[in-house]
Swiss-Prot record:
Pfam family, one: GTP1_OBG
Protein's organism: Protochlamydia amoebophila (strain UWE25)
The protein's name in its UniProt record: GTPase Obg
Positions of disulphide bridges: none
Keywords carried by this UniProt record: Cytoplasm, GTP-binding, Hydrolase, Magnesium, Metal-binding, Nucleotide-binding
An example Gene Ontology molecular-function term: GTPase activity
Subcellular location: Cytoplasm
Gene3D superfamilies for this protein: GTP1/OBG domain (2.70.210.12), P-loop containing nucleotide triphosphate hydrolases (3.40.50.300)
Span of domain Obg: 1-158
EC code: 3.6.5.-
Length: 337
């Protein structure tokens, strides 16, 4: 199951307690203090991992604790430090304060680490209180509590290309053809109920990562349909591809769909309208596609190097689209997230 938002409580380990102990050796009746300090509590550390694509692991784990430190011992033995709790999250995860919504950290790079909750300090044993004027202290201190944070993890997919379109526009078929993914494809709305992330392997060992988000409908920016839950997944993409159904399904036209898609994306985040984009007219193998394509070209002045006519089912026009995607991505400087 794809999970892209969770709220959890993270608790660092408590420091171990210091102890009161005395040297007990033969012929040394007053051996002096020998109580050791407590160990440090384990910290909670989050680490980005490219091998993870969802927050599903956290779905039924709402409270997570690091190990507490061990208590000190006699003969000045220090307690064992608690083991740090290292939690793996996907690249593209935002770490937020659950109450205020403030972003604490943004995980972008693989193996990137962030210490969120520091473990508690170990308490002092009576040996540490010994001074020249106080040779037999009979006191010790407890370890301090570890830090606690109530946080929200929110995943925004990191991809080179984001596919944007109405339900049934053919996004899943296109990403299946381009990236070889086995995604659910059928002729009814919202077949894609979660984002799909695939990649195209290029000849120079480079990859183009493609994100297919569930279909956008009118009112998505106001959380209609699947709405805001998935619109955020296109925020990190470097290139948008608008997939338009040229067959005129459900009485809609490519002109209508393109206008609504631009309006919804602009209402959600106006900066996305400044993102480089390509327009793809899909299903050119259908009977009514020529008239709808002609109408679209009349309504919108889109240059020929940004407009592609394809059949995702039959693979027509896909090679030209891949070449243009590669070219546009090589021209575009990396976006600051």
């Amino acid at each position: 199951m794809f999970v892209d938002r969770v709220i959890i409580e993270l608790i660092a380990g408590k420091g171990g307690n210091g102890v009161v102990a005395w040297r007990r050796e033969k012929y040394i009746p007053k051996g002096g203090p020998a109580g050791g300090n407590g160990g440090r509590g384990g910290s909670v550390i989050l680490e980005a991992d490219t091998q993870i694509s969802s927050l599903d692991w956290f779905r039924h784990r709402r409270i997570l604790k690091a190990q507490s430190g061990g208590d000190g011992g006699g003969n000045c033995r220090q307690g064992k430090n608690g083991t740090d709790l290292i939690l793996k999250v996907p690249c593209g995860t935002l770490l937020k304060d659950a109450k205020s919504g403030k972003v604490i950290h943004d995980f972008v790079e693989d193996k990137e680490r962030f210490v969120l909750c520091k473990g508690g300090r170990g308490g002092r044993g009576n040996d540490s209180f010994k001074t020249p004027t106080h040779q037999a202290p009979n006191i010790c201190t407890e370890g301090t509590l570890g830090e606690i944070h109530h946080i929200e993890l929110e995943l925004k997919l990191i991809a080179d290309v984001g596919l944007v379109g109405f339900p049934n526009a053919g996004k899943s078929t296109l990403i299946s053809s381009l990236a070889g993914l086995r995604v659910k494809v059928a002729a009814y709305p919202f077949t894609t109920l979660q984002p799909n992330l695939g990649f195209i392997e290029l000849d120079n060992y480079k990859r183009i990562y493609i994100a297919d988000i569930p279909g956008i409908i009118e009112g998505a920016s106001h959380n209609r349909g699947l709405g805001l839950e998935f619109l955020r997944h296109i925020e990190r993409t470097k290139l948008l591809i608008f997939i338009l159904d040229a067959s005129g399904i459900d009485g809609r036209t490519p002109s209508h769909d393109f206008r609504i898609l631009r309006e919804e994306i602009g209402a959600y985040n106006p900066e996305l309208l400044e993102r480089p984009y390509l327009v793809v007219l899909n299903k050119i193998d259908t009977e009514d596609s020529p008239s709808h394509i002609q109408e679209f070209e009349k309504n919108f002045s889109i240059s020929s190097d940004m407009l592609f006519k394809i059949s995702a089912v039959y693979g027509e026009g896909l090679q030209e689209l891949i070449e243009k995607m590669t070219q546009r991505l090589s021209q575009k400087k990396e976006i600051e997230y």
